[in-house]
Amino acid sequence: MASKSKPSHSHDHHQWDSREYVSKWAAGQDPKEKDREAAFRVLADTIPFERNAPIRILDLGAGYGALTGFLLDRFPRATAVCQDGSQEMAKLGSERMEKFAGRFEYVLCDFAQKGWQHRLQGSFAAVVSSIAIHNVRAPKLIEAIYHDIYPLVESGGCFLNFDRPRPPWEDQMAWLRAAGFTRVKIFWRGENRAVFGGFRDK
């Protein structure tokens, strides 16, 4: 695990290097847990592996582990790598996911910085993200991130993103197809949020 990195969320107004800010922000997200449950459930059901499969998951911009924890609960033999740029968020996530100790680790790096993917080892059955990538706020950079993600997905695996339409979902899905993903579509749509992504064919 890396010990020092620039925050992957440095492209917006959040203060992810502040323990107090991170704790207050996470507490503000807790009431939204029920709202995102439907999206998380669809995302989990879309991962093309049996529940008892010993899959490896990568959560991009994992934050305090809301999605990671949901998936580790749904896939009891899975392990996860939580990528995030905030050391304070990683500390909070490690505390909140204590019951999954030994099944996850944090890697601190900035997915908006070139070469971020080289900080990760191996490939993943599922690469996922939740309300994170839109924070980059640079369409060309988001397109490049999707190209970086593709080699991280193992044959037969998937990339699934629960995020806002910034940039528009149609543009993002076109970038996923250009990166090599197949069967790209929106799997769930809510108010100003959707689960979309694609698969890496065997």
Give, region by region, the residue ranges found by the protein language model.
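A short glycine-rich, Lys/Arg-flanked "PGG" loop and its adjoining helix->strand segment in the class I
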Residues: E143-S155
